[in-house]
Amino acid sequence: MEKVKAWLIKYKWWIVAAIGGLAAFLLLKNRGGGSGGGGEYMVGSGPVYQQAGSGAVDNTMALAALQANTQLSAQNAQLQAQMDASRLQLETQLNIETLAADNAHYSTQSQLQLGMAQVDLSKYLGDLQSTTSTALAGMQSDTAKYQSNIQLQAENIRANTSLAEIDAQKYIVGKQADIAKYQAKTERRGQDYGFALGLLNFGGKFF
């Protein structure tokens, strides 16, 4: 059905021309002819008058009118076909140009979006690198501070240990001195007790 419809659309003017020519032929044939009778024939858009003549002349004029109408219809059909072909060509060209423009627009939009994506990626990588560098610098600074604090604490511990050792040494020396003094005092007391005891023993001999 679609093929028949397409064929009718394609050859519609030829069909119209053929029907018009056939109708004109039948009309002129019915009106023409007869002895002494006049006939009126249409050629194109103007009448052709036959004042008087035989049936042969009428038939000749009818045939001429039919040929003229048929030729005119054929020319109109050909012109319409050319116009349809030109319109189809223009529409096809327009569709091609529109498609090319759409493709160009799509390509431009794609390139623009790709460029924007690359810019966003570069910005993201730059921000990430900056953030990473800042964080790394902070970690290095914290590590340095921590190491410095550890070292300071170690030095303080060593210093306190040295002071404790000095204090212990002083304490030991002091205790040793006290012991020596106590021993000396004890020895003196012993000597004093011995001397006193000797005196008592010596005095006892006389009494």
From Swiss-Prot:
The keyword Zinc-finger does not apply. One of its GO terms (cellular component) is virion membrane. Keywords: Capsid inner membrane protein, Coiled coil, Membrane, Transmembrane, Transmembrane helix, Viral genome ejection through host cell envelope, Viral penetration into host cytoplasm, Virion, Virus entry into host cell. Signal peptide: none annotated. It is a single-pass membrane protein. The keyword Transmembrane helix applies. Residues 64-95 form a coiled coil. It is found in: Virion membrane. GO terms for biological process: symbiont entry into host cell. Disulfide bonds: none annotated. Its main location: virion. The chain crosses the membrane at residues 13-28. Component of the phage ejection machinery. Pilot protein for the formation of the tube that conducts the genome into the target cell. Probably involved in penetration of the bacterial outer membrane and for making the peptidoglycan layer accessible to the viral transglycosylase. Essential for viral infectivity. This is Infectivity protein P11. The lineage of its organism: Viruses, Varidnaviria, Bamfordvirae, Preplasmiviricota, Tectiliviricetes.
